[in-house]
Each structure stands twice: as C-alpha cells, then as structure tokens.
Regions:
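Oxyanion-hole/transition-state-stabilizing segment in secreted/luminal serine hydrolases
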Residues: 64-70
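Non-catalytic scaffold segments within catalytic domains of secreted glycoside hydrolases
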Residues: 2-45, 51, 55-57, 71-392
Length: 392
C-alpha cells in the first residue's frame, strides 16, 4: 500500500529487539476511581533498579508513559517533574524509552467527548516534545500518542468501563480520540520533524463458528476488520477530514495477548496452547503477515504477556512465532513484554495478575521477585534472536 520514500523504515530504530513495558495506566476504572499503576507497581520507587534489571538481561528498549492525568492537573499547566526523572535516569542507564502520551487516562475535567479534548491533547504533545528536546537535544524520539484507541473507545464508549462511561458511543469516542491523535502528531512534528510514531493497537482474530453460512462469515469478517479503523484514519484512507497522512502510519505496534482471538457468535476465546492447534486459531505469524500485506509497514509486537503459571510457556510460544516471522523476511522490529513487572487489576487493586517476568509478592514493599522460568525463556529467546543476527 505504501512506499518507503517518507521514512527510513528499512532501519530498525530500536536499541534491542526484546523490549519491556512498564505499566503506566492512569485512567478512571469501572468504579470511577483514578488508578495509577506506575505508583501501584512501585515503578516510581524502584525506577533505577528496574532499569538495571532489564540491562542485566540485555533489554535496552522500554515503553513508559507520561501519565497525562498527573502531568496536567490544571489546563495547559504541566508538571514534568516525574517525566524529567525518567528521562534523566534512562539517559544515565543507556535505556531507550518509547513514550506513551496517553495510556488510557486523561485529566479529571476531560473525556474524549469533551469539545476541547483534541486541543488539550495536541498542546500536551507539543509541550512534551519541547521539554524532552530541552533535556535530550539529539537522538531519535519515538512516541505513541494514544495507546489502544480501539480498546479504549470500546471500554469507555460501549462497555462503561472508564470515562466517558457510555453505551453505543464507541465510534464517537474513537473518532474524537483520532482527531486528537492526528492533531497531536501535527504539533509534535512542528517542533521536531524527525519524531517517529509507533501506533499500538490490539491485534485480534474474530471468526465464525458457522463457516458454511455466508452471512456468518461476512459478519465475523466485518467485526475482524474493524480493528483497522484506527490505522485507516491515521493514514487518511477514511475520515480524511481529520487530516491523516500515510507517513503518520510509521511503525505499527500490535498488542497481542492469549485472549485476542474469539468466536463472533459466542465471544468464546479460542485456546492458544492446544496441540495440534484449534482449527479456527490463527498463528501470530499469520496475523502479522496480514497486517504487513495491508499496510507495508514495519511491525513491533508492542505488548504481550500471560498471567499465572503459563507465562513462561507463552513467552516460548511468542518466541517461536517471532523467529518464524523473521525467517520469512517480514520486517519485525521488536517484541515488548508488557507488563515487565507485575501489576494489580484496574478494577480490583488487591488482585495481582502475576503476568510480568518480575513478580510482586509483598504488596507492601513491592519488592521485585524474578520469575525464574520466565527469565530463562527470555534468555533463550535472546539467544535465538542473536543466532539470526537481528542485532549483529
């Protein structure tokens, strides 16, 4: 669909193929309570140690968020103190940060349906780049303006799981967030034209349990393709009035979890670990290939993890798929394990997912405990990547 004239996309901009993401959600949960998983997971306290742990296993690229709701408590007034600390420590530790400007949360006085949402967000984006470049004048800056617009528009617009707590407004929320997303890119590029954009959206598979029925097939395919509305708006294929451009669809991050494939009619999740595979389950390689065929852009597995006892098995499964993708010649630029450190549930902060490669057992000290099997799986994954000389 696209050529490579507008961006040096043939060059991988990431320091390491394996990446780690720190939970930074700061939204209002299903009960209307503000969550701060950056603080709840202890990342604020263990920031330096967390980076040291990742350096020890040669993960040098991470995802962090600025937490919009904490940066802008008064309209157009910004407190960058915590962001400055992350920038300084990451620079000192030689860690590359990919920045989320909005990771589910917005200031108390805003929702995506607020008439000033896009303006507030775009000014935030501009001021972030100005602040960042005042501290780091050189080098590449990679930004995700809004994480998972597709999921967030469903959660807040259709499922009443976060602000604006609506039903039947998913498209309106998505449209408004994409207006903000694009205006944010425009203002960031005014400050720094070299900025790279990594979109991060769920990669899903929706199928019918009645493939002999043409109407069921068409309905499942329609639902499946809705995952690409955000991408199509961003590159201007649909909703051109929002000023999307092909070059804005720069690096495509796909967030892929164990429950990302389901049956349209029943919403039953397709099992991922069966041998031989469930006949309706698509490999990650197949899903990634379909994204590349559609857009022709480099791809990153921008989030993946599994809770509980199967997390190491999941890492091995993802490693196998990534190696298969790389051997096929598709431009897979990286794989990010998210969360890299355990986190509590948004709606029940007493329940911990145990999905990171570092566990939190003592919820008072929030001390990190390595999950030995997950660490081993990561190290083996790294060996396979090195054997392919992806980062020779």
């Amino acid at each position: 669909m696209f050529n490579n004239d507008f961006s040096p996309s043939h060059q991988n901009p990431f320091k390491s193929f394996l990446m780690g993401g720190f939970e930074c959600a700061d939204h209002l949960n299903a009960f209307g309570n503000r969550v701060d998983l950056f603080q709840a997971s202890g990342h604020d306290h263990y920031l330096e140690e967390d980076y040291d742990r990742l350096n020890q296993i040669e993960i040098q690229t991470i995802r962090e968020g600025i937490r919009w709701s904490f940066v802008e408590t008064i309209p157009y007034c910004y407190d960058w103190s915590e962001v400055e600390r992350i920038i300084k420590i990451s620079q000192d530790k030689n860690v590359q940060v990919v920045w989320d400007i909005c990771h589910f949360g917005f200031p108390d006085d805003l929702t995506p349906l607020h008439p000033m949402f896009a303006r507030r967000f775009s000014h935030l984006c501009r001021e972030f780049v100005i602040k960042y470049r005042s501290l780091v004048p050189d080098g590449l800056l990679i930004v995700t303006p809004i994480n998972e617009v597709s999921f967030l528009s469903w959660l807040g617009g259709d499922a009443r799981g976060t602000s604006p707590y609506c039903v039947g407004q998913g498209w309106e929320v998505k449209y408004s967030m994409m207006k903000a997303y694009i205006e944010g890119i425009e203002m960031m590029k005014e400050v720094d034209p070299s900025i790279r954009i990594m979109i991060t959206e769920p990669l899903i598979g929706i199928v019918t349990n009645d493939p002999a029925n043409i109407l069921s097939l068409m309905e499942a395919e329609k639902k499946h393709l809705e995952q690409f509305q955000v991408h199509d708006i961003l590159c201007g294929t649909i909703c051109p009035e929002l000023r999307g451009k092909p070059e804005y669809l720069d690096i495509i991050g796909v967030n892929y979890y164990y429950n990302n494939q389901w049956i349209n009619e029943t919403h039953a999740f397709l099992p991922w670990a069966e041998e031989p595979p469930h006949p309706l389950f698509r490999s990650l390689h197949s899903l990634v290939e379909s994204v590349f065929i559609r857009y022709g852009r480099p791809i990153v597995i921008s989030e993946t993890s599994h809770p509980g006892e199967d997390r190491a098995k999941w890492i091995c499964s993802i490693a196998k798929e990534c190696i298969s993708i790389l051997k096929s010649g598709l431009p897979l630029f990286g794989c990010c394990f998210y969360p890299i450190v355990d986190r509590p549930d948004w709606d029940n902060l007493d329940y911990w997912h145990h999905s990171g490669i570092f566990d939190i057992v003592d919820t008072n000290s929030l001390k990190r405990v390595p999950d030995a099997m997950s660490i081993h799986a990561i190290i083996e994954f790294k060996k396979q990547i090195n054997a392919l000389q992806v980062f020779a």
